[in-house]
């Protein structure tokens, strides 16, 4: 199957500048293309993964990727469809984020092997040395204010206000495309659908300044239930950094995908063939309660992002927590599986009677409720049901001398630390 057709069948093409011309270019030989990643945090997130994996698919098809990390544009901030202006970061902060993101990209693109091995670039290398006068004379003169204000991303900010700094962002992104075309013969840019205005600024600059044709592919944005884009500035991000979103949390994210989205996400986020995905779809629709599509999705993406061992650990944590087998997990695994649950620091001189601890830790509101819960068998300490009102937590209940896991009912977990 032609790579362009595969991208379409996977639902990875939202818009293109000229489908026929792009298809022809991809058929005739190796195409050099780039995707830009602005360092707005110390990690990329799930929203970036769509473009990253699309870039990887093109590389596997023989084309050459350039990964641009925006050391310069990250200092400015992209206004595209943001409700408010981004906070400006120091250069030292952005430089640190650039290094982190470059390391993450190395997990997905091959920077070592073959004539189409990926190349990492940083746009600070060309923006850092350009003067303001040269910027206006050599780049700015090719953009009319009318053209710039016609972009949807700008229109949405005109009423609330947009700084010149952010207004000029599209020129900077356009110049990125121009530089990569001149220096590396890059003719295709890939990005999120919210980037269409910035990306076509690049094709316009190529046309006017160099009389060349550039191509653009936008990939669909992944949205939450409210229709908002997954990304740091909108909250609820699923990060690719395991310190920010653990492999277990990422596993749970995919396991909780709605049935209506599961097969679509298999096409977008995995490298399973379309035939394999079709077989999974048939099995899934025949027995949706078994959640096969979600299980495969969680396995494939967690393995892709964090490795097979991290996937196995996430699966084990899931199974043991579901069964209530707390003691079968290490403290490291428990911290991963119970990240975000209520936590209470037990004081050295605090009485460790179960009833009193349930109240002092905030697990229940009163001693009466605590006694009822214990007597009714609703309280578990490290997976063991406790029904003795006089039970006192001892050192034996401190897992690896660090924590105790309290469960109230079937699913409400609490962690006591020492």
Curated annotation (Swiss-Prot):
GO terms for molecular function: ATP binding; RNA binding; tyrosine-tRNA ligase activity. Keywords: Aminoacyl-tRNA synthetase, ATP-binding, Cytoplasm, Ligase, Nucleotide-binding, Protein biosynthesis, RNA-binding. L-tyrosine binds at residues 34, 169, 173. A motif ('HIGH' region) lies at residues 39-48. ATP binds at residue 232. GO terms for biological process: tyrosyl-tRNA aminoacylation. Its main location: cytoplasm. Residues 352-418 form the S4 RNA-binding domain. SMART domains: S4 (SM00363). GO terms for cellular component: cytosol. Signal peptide: none annotated. It is found in: Cytoplasm. SUPFAM superfamilies: Alpha-L RNA-binding motif, Nucleotidylyl transferase. Its EC number is 6.1.1.1. A motif ('KMSKS' region) lies at residues 229-233. HAMAP family: Tyr_tRNA_synth_type1. Belongs to the class-I aminoacyl-tRNA synthetase family. TyrS type 1 subfamily. Catalyzes the attachment of tyrosine to tRNA(Tyr) in a two-step reaction: tyrosine is first activated by ATP to form Tyr-AMP and then transferred to the acceptor end of tRNA(Tyr). Homodimer. This is Tyrosine--tRNA ligase. It comes from Streptococcus pneumoniae (strain 70585). The gene is tyrS.
């Amino acid at each position: 199957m032609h790579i362009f057709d595969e991208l379409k069948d996977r639902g990875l093409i939202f818009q293109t500048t000229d489908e026929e011309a792009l298809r022809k270019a991809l058929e005739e030989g190796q195409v050099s293309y780039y995707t830009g990643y602005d360092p707005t945090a110390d990690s990329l997130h799930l929203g970036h993964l769509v473009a990253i994996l699309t870039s990887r698919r093109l590389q596997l098809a023989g084309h050459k990727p350039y990964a641009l990390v925006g050391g310069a544009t990250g200092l400015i901030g992209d206004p595209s469809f943001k409700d408010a202006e981004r906070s400006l970061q120091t250069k030292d902060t952005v430089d640190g984020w650039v290094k982190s993101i470059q390391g993450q990209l190395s997990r997905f693109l091959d920077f070592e092997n073959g004539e189409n091995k990926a190349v990492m670039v940083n746009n600070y290398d060309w923006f850092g040395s350009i003067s303001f006068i040269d910027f206006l004379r050599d780049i700015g003169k090719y953009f009319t204010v009318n053209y710039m204000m016609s972009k949807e991303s700008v229109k949405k900010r005109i009423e609330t206000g947009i700084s010149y700094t952010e207004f000029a962002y599209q020129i900077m992104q356009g110049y990125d495309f121009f530089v990569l075309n001149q220096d590396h013969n890059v003719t295709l840019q890939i990005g999120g659908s919210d980037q269409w205005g910035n990306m076509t600024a690049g094709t316009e600059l190529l046309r006017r300044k160099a009389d060349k044709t550039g191509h653009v592919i936008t990939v669909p944005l992944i949205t939450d239930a409210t229709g908002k884009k997954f990304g740091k500035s909108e909250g609820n991000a699923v990060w690719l950094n395991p310190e920010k979103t653990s492999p277990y949390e990422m596993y749970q994210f995919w396991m909780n995908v709605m049935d209506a989205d599961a097969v679509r996400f298999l096409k977008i986020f995995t490298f399973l063939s379309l035939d394999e995905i079709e077989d999974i779809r048939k099995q899934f629709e025949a027995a949706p309660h078994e959640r096969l599509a979600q299980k495969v999705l969680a396995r494939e993406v967690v393995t892709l992002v964090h490795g097979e061992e991290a996937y196995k650990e996430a699966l084990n944590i899931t199974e043991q927590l579901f069964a209530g087998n707390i003691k079968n997990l290490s403290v490291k695994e428990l911290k991963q599986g119970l990240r975000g649950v209520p936590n209470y620091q037990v004081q050295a001189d605090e009485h460790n009677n179960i009833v009193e601890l349930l109240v002092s830790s905030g697990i229940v509101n009163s001693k009466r409720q605590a006694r009822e819960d214990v007597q009714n068998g609703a309280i578990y300490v490290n997976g063991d049901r406790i029904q003795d009102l006089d039970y006192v937590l001892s050192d034996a209940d401190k897992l690896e001398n660090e924590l105790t896991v309290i469960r109230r009912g079937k699913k409400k977990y609490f962690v006591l630390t020492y």
